[in-house]
Curated annotation (Swiss-Prot):
Keyword Repeat tagged: yes
Family assignment from sequence similarity: Belongs to the PPR family. P subfamily.
Region (Disordered): 525-583
SUPFAM superfamilies: HCP-like
PPR-type repeats, residues: 138-172, 173-207, 208-242, 246-280, 281-312, 313-347, 348-382, 383-417, 418-452, 453-487
InterPro entries: Pentatricopeptide_rpt, TPR-like_helical_dom_sf
Keyword Repeat annotated: yes
Protein name, per record: Pentatricopeptide repeat-containing protein At3g59040
NCBIfam families for this protein: PPR
Keywords from the UniProt entry: Repeat
Amino acid sequence: MSQAVIFKPFVSVPSSNHSQRKLQNNIINVGVKIQNRFRVVCMGMLAPRKFLQKRRKMEVFKDAADETDQKRWRGLMLEIESTGSAVPVLRQYKTDGDQGLPRDLVLGTLVRFKQLKKWNLVSEILEWLRYQNWWNFSEIDFLMLITAYGKLGNFNGAERVLSVLSKMGSTPNVISYTALMESYGRGGKCNNAEAIFRRMQSSGPEPSAITYQIILKTFVEGDKFKEAEEVFETLLDEKKSPLKPDQKMYHMMIYMYKKAGNYEKARKVFSSMVGKGVPQSTVTYNSLMSFETSYKEVSKIYDQMQRSDIQPDVVSYALLIKAYGRARREEEALSVFEEMLDAGVRPTHKAYNILLDAFAISGMVEQAKTVFKSMRRDRIFPDLWSYTTMLSAYVNASDMEGAEKFFKRIKVDGFEPNIVTYGTLIKGYAKANDVEKMMEVYEKMRLSGIKANQTILTTIMDASGRCKNFGSALGWYKEMESCGVPPDQKAKNVLLSLASTQDELEEAKELTGIRNETATIIARVYGSDDDEEGVEDISSESSDDEDEGDDDDDDARETVLYDKPQEGSLGYGSLQTEELVGL
């Protein structure tokens, strides 16, 4: 039976879901919008958008007195934010002039910092107001103070405020108990938080929807998944439940199953929302997309969200861009970013860094440069992660001269390289077999007070073994233990792969503790890979039919060469609970 020969096109085609969605939009909106991929070529990559340009806002005031008050308040807010402390600034404003410190100004400041979730400033102002004769500190103020301590995880402060309320003859209510419970949860005392919750269930006050949201969040972050599941199941039982679970509770359960690695249950909870009459939102879909590793699956969820007439936000776009970037589908990643800009969604640091990473992974330096410059143009100034990702673009392009120049620029621009920055440069010199330069960077890192991690030491061991001899690799293997970084399985695999004789293999077996046939197989497989670039070419190829989310591959060489995202290399990769769930 003859076999069909399939030729893969030189330019990769967007995923079926994304391209079909774009085509459907084009049919509906004839002449309004053409497919993003082709428009990128016509307009130029990341062309400026009007909505990103700085515009001067016209302000309207009631009268001259209102203008004075507004500007005074803004000045006060800016001064508090710049100093990081509110009380000294408020004291100064109180003593300046005859006007003193108006009550409305203080109240507005409190409300604004509460909206900004700057609970440290809220608690500082309220603690100060407790002892001011001109301010009538009421029960509402106490409740706001205990809420602030709850958000900060300051259970000592929350307990103290609750004690004061009790002495005043005030009966603790659902707000104060919930705040105390949250303070325990955020303070790492999950059992104490659970005890408060159980007491509320048994003897009152009756837990509110917010109470249930917070206890679910506490259980999930404390890895008490069984307890969270039991609470949620109780809420689903109409006979036992005092209230129905709301959208945020469903979001938290989706996040919990993601965290537990139970994707099937997460999808089941997602699907059950419609039947229970709970509306799905952008956050719901973001929660579901966040744990998918295949760009095809992420794209399907994204398409489903749009079919449901739910508008994606910057997190939605960032998750889809990240999925395409990981799959080395840079054109699709760029297309989605352009779509985001066309939709008038303002990109964040995270979104730009994810797009930058999509090009950096494949060593596309010029495209990465364009993204890097676009950040500044759009008044989103690159941070250290942006610089480190740009550095990795040079490294992945094997342009070590460019990498060295850019590394110097990082310091010139006022940033101090961290362990990931140094590790990226070390990786580059290791790939280039330039051991001397690699060691220079390593020594600079040590002198700057940064301790090497497992990945860096494994990289140096691998390069030393390949470029020098097996004895040098042995020395670095032993160095790991002396540095307090015990060799992991990947380091052991690399050492075994560097053994070129039977004696060296036996010595490696003795050190690693691997004495079975696996050690011999590893040595044969990795020992035959003399051409490193060949290894990289193989690891970077992917079939259209393959699942792109194979991040758990235990290939030692791949780890050493940083082909997979390292922990901390892009801190924006995994989105945190509060951003997804909104608690």
